[in-house]
Amino acid sequence: MTVFEVKYEDLAGRIGTLRTRSGTLETPAFFPVINVLKKDEISIDEIRNIGFKNFITNSYILYKNNYIKDDIHKELRSEEMIIMTDSGAYQILEYGEIGITNLQIVNYQLKIKPDIGVILDLPTGNINDYDNAKKTVYETLKRAEEASEIIVKNQDNNIIWVYPIQGGRYLDLVKTSAEGLSKFEHIYNMAALGSPTVLLEKYMYDTVIDMIYTAKSNIKRGIPFHLFGGGLPHIIPFAVALGVDSFDSASYIIYARDNRYITRTRVYKLEDLEYFPCSCPICSKYTPKDLLEMNEKERTKALAIHNLYTILEEFKATKQAIKEGRLFEYLQEKAYSHPAVYSAFKRLMKYKDYLEKFDPRIRGDPKGLFLFDGNSLHRPEIIRHSRFLERYIQKKDKISIYCYDKAISDTAYDFKEKIREKIADRNESDVFIAVPFFGLIPLEISDSYPLSQFEIPNEIDEDVIDDMKTKIISFLRRNNYQKVELINCEKLGLHIDSISTSS
């Protein structure tokens, strides 16, 4: 059955709808982890009031404590909520053997009827031994096969079953694990990457980016993709850019227990804050000093509620960036919040061709590009234009290159209109505009998006200027112009001598 539909795309990220037996969920989405046995921490009602219509809870804990005996929605009085159940894999990661089998936990989930269920995979975690990591991959594959027969027999339950991908930092194992889904696509309607939690705790964001890319690039694009344990706002938009559709985490409460205050750019110790940089209901009502004077139970709940508001805000900001076609710019903005986040951004740029492949060429309401520095050279629009120049067919023996200057015209559109006025009916040369980031823009296509819909800084970084010169030289070398004319190019340091070796 088709459970996932895409509404908007940007880079390899998307806004979509996940159809479940209890309703439709817009993605990217966050599933707060709730331990329903710990009612003194965060309740389902509080999750709902914050703005979540979904959560994840641990079926192993429910089974072990005989807490839910029938329909989980009815017993938790959450008929309108979308409920995902995890299988106990996290407990295996923490404690080792947990005394329950894969088939037992699958049958239990069939009994309590969550919207989304997970088989009992064997998580790789932060295993540094390749052979042991390999065992977790093949054991998880074995368990996926083992559970498939029961799942097929009970398809009337309309549970979305998740295929867990393991392998940890060993990307060849992640690839093997992801490829295994092809055998079960009619059974498992959702895929999930496991084992990033320990790496995220150690700020190894770039490694997690590698893992996500490897998993995503080895399954079909249309399959919704979940990231277990990905609950920090710092990494969320980068994971979304690669195509992660949903996340879960208990970070909001774990950090709260340790007096840690999550913002969209970093995590603070409560003791280090004089002011709250937030206007959620908690931060509007209390000061850091107020929270420090609370008893531990009250303080933990207050911090957890704030942390959830922050996570929800990050998802809204990420979706808005996708809707506007500005996800790349948003990632650039986020990248400078922490060196580990910048490392994640730089690692993401390693996969720029993958991002370009799925980035839409045409948008319903296109926005102008904001181009900043050398990192902007990796944007899909810039990559596509470079490929276009490689295919350009020379028409004349002469080339006239006008260098773009913001001092002459505020916008690229006005600048190229002035060029048209200058050349009037002259038709003796191929006319181009030299623009940082783009390299050369043929005048005849300069009206097309985004070639006249962009903003660049007044001062251009040297590496961007060097890139422009390289693109121009490469273009001239590929063609056979008998005469090269440069107009108004002194400010960009472009002159005949600098390109003469290309002719």
Swiss-Prot record:
It comes from the Archaea. One of its GO terms (molecular function) is pentosyltransferase activity. The keyword Zinc applies. Keywords: Glycosyltransferase, Metal-binding, Transferase, tRNA processing, Zinc. Its EC number is 2.4.2.48. It is an enzyme of class 2 (transferase). Exchanges the guanine residue with 7-cyano-7-deazaguanine (preQ0) at position 15 in the dihydrouridine loop (D-loop) of archaeal tRNAs. HAMAP family: TgtA_arch. This is tRNA-guanine(15) transglycosylase. It comes from Saccharolobus solfataricus (strain ATCC 35092 / DSM 1617 / JCM 11322 / P2). The lineage of its organism: Archaea, Thermoproteota, Thermoprotei, Sulfolobales, Sulfolobaceae. The gene is tgtA.
